[in-house]
């Protein structure tokens, strides 16, 4: 069975519609696909309606504040009809909107006008993310690549960055649990944290009642995966895997390059056992 438990659609900052994403995943022989758009579950129904043979797991990726870092917690196997979940996600989207407006003001002060308006147009009805800003800035030739825009304008310490006020990790875990889901710490090695801070993060996540951490992601060294697997084991956390697919590209594909080390307890066994 091929599992991919982390990906994005046009319901947040992905390039493919939920239907296109599901069709692509089916072509890639994915059996179980979790749709995990940023702070929304809006793409789930269309994805489920489009699936012919794969199973769609309802999910979301919640932005959290932790010591001034943006940390992402993925919720899997959610009851998306749960009101408390939808209320919390709606609050997050309001924060996104206010942050985006402030990002626009800060960029304008630095002489870069009208970025918020363009980013908003790109996002349409989806929650507005820094990816939308990044696309606008690249389009205007202000940086040579999507990644460089973050280094130059959008990541912490740069002119377009606005300190976050997302919910905290405990609140995200609680929200996910109330909606009968499982809480997964997303991509622990992608936050620009030292190993010491990653250990602290995983340990706190476990203490707060988190269920799993992502251990297998594309382009990760075996050593890194082994290290995350041992951290999970140490804190009695399950393991998850996902591509974090946003757009078709040469180095990231749905369901590819994902395999958990043997000692891991796959998170999907938890809902399969229900
Ligand atoms: P936001 O949740 O609005 O802060 O936007 C975060 C999204 O921007 C992430 O989910 C990624 O898709 C993208 N992103 C964040 N940081 C980077 C980075 N350094 N390089 C490329 N993409 C990034
Ligand atoms: Mn994203
Ligand atoms: Mn993320
Ligand atoms: Mn993601």
Enumerate the predicted regions with their spans.
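Primarily interfacial, aromatic-capped hydrophobic alpha-helices that serve as membrane anchors
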Residues: 273-274
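An N-terminally biased module of ancient metal coordination in phosphate/nucleic-acid-related enzymes
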Residues: 1-70, 154-155, 167-250, 259, ...
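Short clusters of hydrophobic/aromatic residues that line enzyme substrate/ligand-binding pockets
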Residues: 254
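A short acidic, helix-capping loop that chelates divalent metal ions and anchors anionic groups
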Residues: 84, 250-251
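Extended substrate/RNA-proximal surfaces in nucleic-acid metabolism proteins
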Residues: 50-203, 258, 263-265
């Amino acid at each position: 069975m091929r599992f991919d438990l982390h990906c994005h659609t046009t319901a947040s900052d992905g390039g493919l519609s939920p239907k296109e994403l599901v069709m692509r995943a089916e072509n890639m022989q994915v059996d179980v696909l979790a749709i995990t758009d940023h702070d929304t579950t809006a793409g789930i129904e269309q994805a489920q309606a489009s699936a012919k043979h794969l199973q769609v797991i309802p999910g979301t990726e919640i932005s959290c504040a932790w010591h001034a870092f943006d940390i992402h917690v993925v919720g899997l196997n959610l009851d998306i009809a749960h009101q408390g979940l939808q209320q919390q996600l709606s609050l997050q989207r309001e924060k996104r909107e206010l942050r985006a407006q402030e990002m626009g003001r800060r960029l304008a002060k630095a002489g870069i006008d009208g970025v918020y308006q363009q980013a908003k147009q790109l996002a349409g009805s989806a929650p507005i993310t820094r990816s939308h800003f990044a696309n606008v800035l690249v389009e205007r030739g202000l940086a040579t690549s999507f990644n460089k825009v973050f280094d130059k304008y959008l990541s912490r310490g740069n002119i377009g960055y606005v300190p976050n006020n997302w919910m905290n990790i405990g609140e995200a875990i609680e929200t996910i649990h109330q909606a009968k889901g499982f809480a997964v710490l997303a991509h622990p090695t992608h936050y620009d944290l030292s190993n010491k801070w990653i250990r602290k993060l995983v340990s706190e996540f476990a203490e707060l009642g988190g269920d799993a951490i992502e251990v297998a992601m594309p382009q990760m060294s075996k050593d890194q995966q082994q290290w995350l697997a041992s951290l999970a084991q140490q804190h009695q956390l399950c393991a998850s895997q996902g591509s974090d697919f946003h757009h078709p590209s040469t180095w990231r594909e749905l369901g590819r390059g994902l395999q958990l080390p043997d000692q891991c307890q796959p998170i999907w066994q938890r809902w399969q056992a229900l």
